[in-house]
Amino acid sequence: MSIMKKRSSRAADPDELLCCCEYIDRHGSRSHMVACCCDCEDLDEACDRWMNKEPQNPDSVSRALATINDRLRVPWISGARQIDVSLIPPLILLPVFLHIAALHYLLGIIMLTAMPITVLWYYFFTHRKKGRTLFFLGLALFSLFYMFYLFLTQVVPRGEVTELQLAVVTAGVALTVIFLMLTKRGPGLVRPRPSETHSTVTYHSTPPDVDGVYLNGARHQVVIGSRVASSEHTGEPGTEEEEEGVQKRNWCAVCKVVRPQRAGHCRICGVCVLRLDHHCVWINSCVGLANHRTFLLTLLFFLLTSIYGISLVLASVCPDQRVLTALFYCPDVYSQYSSALCFTCAWYSSIVTGGLLHLLLLQILNISLNVTEREARLALREKSAQRRLWGLIVHTGHYSRGFWSNWTEFLTMTEDTQPAGHKTEDLV
């Protein structure tokens, strides 16, 4: 074990390949899965404090949890892959809660009320810490596939669903996954432009106007952004000070770029995104210039598939009721466990569908007014926007050029069509 411990603590060599059970830990050292229980000072300290009945150090507990999370891995060809523990709760809790809710209608009310409250609590908990989590993406994907699995195993065998209807539901699930994959390709990041760089200099000490670029005491060549425009470009007095103020306000110290108009820095992803709309926890990614259209199509196909699937389920388990009323009145549905489970899943899908319908409505209204969700929040914070329809419509008046022009711009927007000017933007 001492040999394994010594091996796991040595520095990583970038030219040396990893075996299937080796990985680079969060400290940059080469480690092995067999050594997962070795050399954990933070865990030892937490156990010692617990054994001695001493108060725990919050930092040591968080470091111990981070170490445990870092060492939860599975063997892979190019090295052991880390397992995100936030993926585990949806895989276990969702089937358990739904099967418990199918036992009795009172349990169904309790579970279907507790589930969204728990998810909202976890959302605000993680959003406050500005941390990334795969919990919501895992919950969304597992809900989609688990509902489809129950549809195939519980509803289709009843004989009420035709082959054409099954093909439509299957195509809807497939299109939802395809457009989700396209959305996950990236929101479109802000890159340094050639016009924003004017010199390449090698520094032996950190300049006062530039962030440090020293790594391990070595000097590195850095490109200095045009954060201050010289007066010779315009020849007008006072332009230098104005340009300096604009450039400094839009300079992102984290990404080392000057943000163009309508771009913003996401604290969760740690990147600057072109035409940033919002960070969506359900896809674990930002929605920006490059993936906004595919994000909208993902929502649309999911909602159409979900609504159609719910109608088929209710028509199967409540044949004597209309689809619009069966969700609220379906007598004897709890007489059989299979029917109760299908009915419970229909209610769960309806709750999810209602939330995503609200999101789709907000997206359509924002696109119609040519405003992003981020711009709407900033305008409301600065009290410079008009609110209508109980806050569903937020009109800033900055970029709107009419309904058809706004939608044309959204459907045809590219990085080249974005305005090059700079505007003061806050972080999200």
Swiss-Prot record:
The active site is at residue 280. Its main location: Golgi. Its EC number is 2.3.1.225. Residues 100-105, 154-160, 316-350 are lumenal. Belongs to the DHHC palmitoyltransferase family. GO terms for molecular function: protein-cysteine S-palmitoyltransferase activity. One of its GO terms (cellular component) is Golgi membrane. The chain crosses the membrane at residues 83-99, 106-125, 133-153, 161-181, 295-315, 351-371. Residues 1-82, 126-132, 182-294, 372-428 are cytoplasmic. One of its GO terms (biological process) is protein targeting to membrane. The gene is zdhhc23b. Keywords: Acyltransferase, Golgi apparatus, Lipoprotein, Membrane, Palmitate, Transferase, Transmembrane, Transmembrane helix. The DHHC domain is required for palmitoyltransferase activity. It is found in: Golgi apparatus membrane; Golgi apparatus, trans-Golgi network membrane. PANTHER family: PALMITOYLTRANSFERASE ZDHHC23, ZINC FINGER DHHC DOMAIN CONTAINING PROTEIN. It is a multi-pass membrane protein. It catalyses: L-cysteinyl-[protein] + hexadecanoyl-CoA = S-hexadecanoyl-L-cysteinyl-[protein] + CoA. The keyword Transmembrane applies. This is Palmitoyltransferase ZDHHC23-B. InterPro entries: Palmitoyltrfase_DHHC (IPR001594), PFA4/ZDH16/20/ERF2-like (IPR039859). Residues 250-300 form the DHHC domain. Palmitoyltransferase that could catalyze the addition of palmitate onto various protein substrates and be involved in a variety of cellular processes.
